[in-house]
Amino acid sequence: MKLKIVHGWKDLPAQARGAAAALGNFDGVHRGHQQVIAEAAKAASALKAPLGVITFDPHPRRLFRPTEPAFRLMTIEQQARVLSGMGVDILYLLPFDFQMASFSDKEFVEQVLVEGLGVKHVAAGFDISFGKGRTGSPEALRDYGQQNGFGVSIAAPVAGRAGDKFSSTSVRDALREGQPEEAARILGRPFAIEGVVRRGQQLGRQLGFPTANVEIVDYVVPKLGVYATRTRLPDGREVPGVANLGNNPTTGEVETRLETWLFDFDEDLYGQVIETQLIAFLRPELKFDSIELMVEQIRRDEAQARAIVAPGF
């Protein structure tokens, strides 16, 4: 069954109701989130119901703290792809507006989950809070489930080898510290930036290493610098490469973007959507005294990146 995206919760058709659904923000869909979705999947199988994920767009933080720097770990499109790969049937995108924010926990359950979505089962994380003032708790959700005739399961916390709890915040912290490997450990896959390839100054092409340039818009900004990468093309191919994340101080750029040199690749990608995984942090961004010195360093970056993402080539 192909993933269906449902916007909103009012006046839904019968086929969009009656799911066993995981409830949460699920930014990044990390391994802790995956445990919540697995709980919903068990219920969906037992109830012979569609497997759903209930989340919010925009993220609640965007409504309450509109001036806060970008923090998202994935776009809705990326989230939908990951969830589809996990077997999710329906992704409910609930508009998080002032009406939604005004609902008490009881109103949210009764008006949105029961009347709107007609849920048969809700799975949530051990630390879930919902409703105005974040008054809803796992215990409250269980009580509301009993009162309204839907099942509830609460996923236990998922911890790593060091006993740390998996969270979206820990992923963001790892990325800001230049530790994409740690971010990937928590996510269960590499962190990736997706966007439309835009034209740059063409300097890289003139110097022999053309780059695919993508602006960083709503994503959390990882530590600026150079990364070994893998890029997924629109046709599904994956190409190793090396990328500069930053504003290129040598050439005086001011916008933060990801400029990726795809190894052994010379096709036109302008206007196309690509997704670039950050595999390993190689070095901070540097300002060079000359273009020649910059080229020498890029060649060293290439050798280091190839050893990581394209060994033997």
PLM features: what roles do these ranges have?
Residues 62-148:
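N-terminal Rossmann-like or analogous alpha/beta NTP/dinucleotide-binding catalytic cores
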Residues 200-313:
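Phosphate/ribose-recognition catalytic cores of enzymes acting on nucleotide-derived substrates
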